[in-house]
């Protein structure tokens, strides 16, 4: 899906904005000390405050404020000197109080941006700045489980788990600057990456730690007014975000071209059927009857505290990507892969700091090491094969002490147990044969054992050199220096 989609009636442009709900990784909830542990038995992490029982008062968790401000700083948002909490009124079974504590007209932060690298299919990767309207704090709702349906309508009965109710959220609202499903997915991915680098959220979409709602409309041309906006929910992966946007763009275009109206509504993404379906009409902010929460005072973050938090921010993914390209000469792709996960980036930098060449380290991490880590669901921070041990192995390869083939053979043991590649090589006699005299002797023995192939080579069948290289590697157990072996073999085959 491109930014402008051609049709019989001209070019259509999609206008997309995202509301990203990030669960902040505090041990207790936003206004009470109830636990935030995921996956425990239903309704075991609730208390009178969560349930809104008479006589209870909420108290803001200071760690929530710190995490929200740090997230806002990383998104280049302006931190408000004063902000407040409001009550968002609506009735639904997942809200025990019948209102949600959120922030309406005075959020903690406004007017920011991030830049995302977008790799559209068939196009060069491009950089795009996406505006961010605001970040505000709020409490999460409980979770409904509908028997016999994926929503309330059509279910035989519903169960509610309030363990999630009251968990702290940072809602990040983008400006309508996105134009394709791919841009939307890349934006959401970068938001999660930043939150993980900060350590304020694990961003696990399967557990609901990061949830995105898409607001999308289409218009005929970049100068046309916005069309009717539709909200899409129920996307639990970046791929689903992209596909939902692409489907909805086409659905709206077809509706307009058929003379039908596009209704302002909330729709659900159906992963199985790969389509969006109507859920309910979309409420406006006036429907929620916001008013300041009388139980919570205004929020003021003093300058000294704010700047103290700023000094604790890590180097962010975009800065790392740029530095890796400049400092280490890595490609855009390599820099992107290595910085996708904070622990992977730290592992890479530690190996390079131990003296290994950056490109070699990058190749091993992105290949065999990443495959092992992902297959075994491990973390780079706890991997037995430490960065300095990887650096030693890469240095052995670059120094001609072992071949890449030998490194691959010993790597599984190193990944599982850790240890020194040099010690294993020395103990098992796996070092590369780089003595010209020794290789010359082996080459001469091979040529003497295959006179017909030698004659054929000298008769013009030069591809037979590959046969001799294979025989040489087989005879030496893959330990012959490939460059030197090819050089001597070529010389001897030509009669030298």
From Swiss-Prot:
Keyword Protein biosynthesis attributed: yes
SMART domains with a match to the protein in the record: GatB_Yqey
Top-rank lineage group of the source organism: Bacteria
Broad EC category: ligase
Pfam family, one: GatB_N
Gene3D superfamilies membership: 1.10.10.410, GatB domain, N-terminal subdomain (1.10.150.380)
Catalysed reactions, as listed in the record: L-glutamyl-tRNA(Gln) + L-glutamine + ATP + H2O = L-glutaminyl-tRNA(Gln) + L-glutamate + ADP + phosphate + H(+); L-aspartyl-tRNA(Asn) + L-glutamine + ATP + H2O = L-asparaginyl-tRNA(Asn) + L-glutamate + ADP + phosphate + 2 H(+)
Family from the record: Belongs to the GatB/GatE family. GatB subfamily.
Assembly: Heterotrimer of A, B and C subunits.
Biological role: Allows the formation of correctly charged Asn-tRNA(Asn) or Gln-tRNA(Gln) through the transamidation of misacylated Asp-tRNA(Asn) or Glu-tRNA(Gln) in organisms which lack either or both of asparaginyl-tRNA or glutaminyl-tRNA synthetases. The reaction takes place in the presence of glutamine and ATP through an activated phospho-Asp-tRNA(Asn) or phospho-Glu-tRNA(Gln).
Name this protein carries in UniProt: Aspartyl/glutamyl-tRNA(Asn/Gln) amidotransferase subunit B
Organism annotation: Prochlorococcus marinus (strain MIT 9303)
